[in-house]
């Protein structure tokens, strides 16, 4: 029988962080590096826990080279060949600890994943990515991958509720990707009516994961550095970005010139374009759940990274968190009806 959950669920746009007394004199005093020990792999992580999404327009080797310099992480998309992986690994050995090899749950994807991890043993992270992390098939797949790679750290998703976070962690995953439908080029909510407001999903899933000594990634829904800070404040251990990293020199996607202006194509991995590119088209039994956009060309991604990290540091100073680790403990969200003054909203 249908049921309505009357609890209010919130998104990033519905809240602001309340400022609090601080002893910090400067943003430069804020430490953004986090260290984690993972539940199932027993591996250690140290870095700034912002991840480039495993989309072919974002999770590129070019992106990984730059993000690695800032101690950020990249989930490399699954469409690189083993030869491309080997070439990148030989030229960029220092980056290999800051990236994950991605896979879907199909047998061909898994075979390629095995080849990559056997050829490049320095890669210690696996990103298992499906649109619907609630299927029994996916849970069994996570168990199989854990059995095959007992010492690799496994990211798995996507889900939005605590009980599924717990099931995936108990099945062998270390870090659960949280988010269904919040992405800038995702149309799942429009096509299916399924989803969950991202802020509430992160808070509830973080609580479930941390109770089992697991971790979560807030995946999708960030449109500005303030949203990234809110995700960390809500309890996310990592934040994954797609649209915010699209449109750069290091991003994938075709470069288009029109009327003297440059654009880069950015599209969801369930869009018609992605399915034509990798699957020969949209299967007759399914619908496209992603859109295609032309992002104004932004140049090198380094400037955007500095802007994001600067915003997070500033958040920490406003709430009195000397370390990113302390941000969630210093967070009080207030519900709002308006985020910003809209008078010059069309100006850069």
Curated annotation (Swiss-Prot):
NADP(+) binds at residues 26-27, 78, 129-131, 180-181, 269, 285-286, 314-317. Keywords: Acetylation, Metal-binding, NADP, Oxidoreductase, Potassium, Purine metabolism. It holds the Pfam family IMPDH. GO terms for biological process: GMP catabolic process; GMP metabolic process; IMP salvage; monocyte differentiation; purine nucleobase metabolic process. Its EC number is 1.7.1.7. Signal peptide: none annotated. InterPro entries: Aldolase_TIM, GMP_reductase, GMPR, IMP_DH/GMP_Rdtase_CS, IMP_DH_GMPRt. The keyword Metal-binding applies. GO terms for cellular component: GMP reductase complex. One of its GO terms (molecular function) is GMP reductase activity. SUPFAM superfamilies: Inosine monophosphate dehydrogenase (IMPDH). The modification N6-acetyllysine is found at residue 291. K(+) binds at residues 181, 183, 186, 189. It catalyses: IMP + NH4(+) + NADP(+) = GMP + NADPH + 2 H(+). GMP binds at residues 219-221, 242-243, 268-270, 286-290. The active site is at 186 (thioimidate intermediate), 188 (proton donor/acceptor). NCBIfam families: GMP_reduct_1, PRK05096.1. Homotetramer. Catalyzes the irreversible NADPH-dependent deamination of GMP to IMP. It functions in the conversion of nucleobase, nucleoside and nucleotide derivatives of G to A nucleotides, and in maintaining the intracellular balance of A and G nucleotides. Plays a role in modulating cellular differentiation. Belongs to the IMPDH/GMPR family. GuaC type 1 subfamily. This is GMP reductase 2. It comes from Mus musculus. The lineage of its organism: Eukaryota, Metazoa, Chordata, Craniata, Vertebrata.
């Amino acid at each position: 029988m249908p049921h309505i959950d009357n609890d209010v669920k919130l998104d990033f746009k519905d809240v602001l962080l309340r400022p609090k007394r601080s002893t910090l004199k400067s943003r430069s005093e804020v430490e953004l590096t986090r260290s984690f020990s993972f539940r199932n792999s027993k591996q250690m992580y140290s870095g700034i826990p912002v991840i480039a999404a495993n989309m072919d327009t974002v999770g590129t080797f070019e992106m990984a080279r730059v993000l690695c310099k800032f101690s950020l992480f990249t989930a490399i998309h699954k469409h690189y060949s083993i030869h491309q992986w080997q070439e990148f690994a030989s030229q960029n050995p220092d980056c290999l600890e800051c990236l994950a090899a991605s896979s879907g749950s199909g047998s061909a994807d898994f075979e390629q994943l095995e080849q990559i991890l056997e050829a490049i043993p320095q890669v210690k992270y696996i990103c298992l990515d499906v649109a619907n992390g609630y299927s029994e098939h996916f849970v069994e797949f996570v168990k199989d991958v854990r059995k095959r790679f007992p010492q690799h750290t496994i990211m798995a998703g996507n889900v939005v509720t605590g009980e599924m976070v717990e099931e995936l962690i108990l099945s062998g995953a270390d870090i659960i990707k949280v988010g269904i439908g919040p992405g800038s080029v995702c149309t799942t909510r429009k096509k299916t009516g399924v989803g969950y407001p991202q802020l509430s999903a992160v808070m509830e899933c973080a609580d479930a994961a941390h109770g089992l000594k697991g971790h979560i990634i807030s995946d999708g829904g960030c449109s500005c550095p303030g949203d990234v800070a809110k995700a960390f404040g809500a309890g996310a251990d990592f934040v994954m970005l797609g649209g915010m990293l699209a449109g750069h020199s290091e991003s994938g996607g075709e470069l288009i010139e029109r009327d003297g202006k440059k654009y880069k194509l950015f599209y969801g991995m369930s869009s018609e374009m992605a399915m034509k590119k990798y699957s020969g088209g949209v299967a007759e039994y399914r619908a496209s759940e992603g859109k295609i956009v032309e992002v104004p060309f932004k140049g090198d991604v380094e400037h955007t990274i500095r802007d994001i990290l600067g915003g997070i540091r500033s958040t920490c100073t406003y709430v009195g968190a000397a370390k990113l680790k302390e941000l969630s403990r210093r967070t009080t969200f207030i519900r709002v009806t308006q985020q910003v003054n809209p008078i010059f909203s069309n100006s850069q």
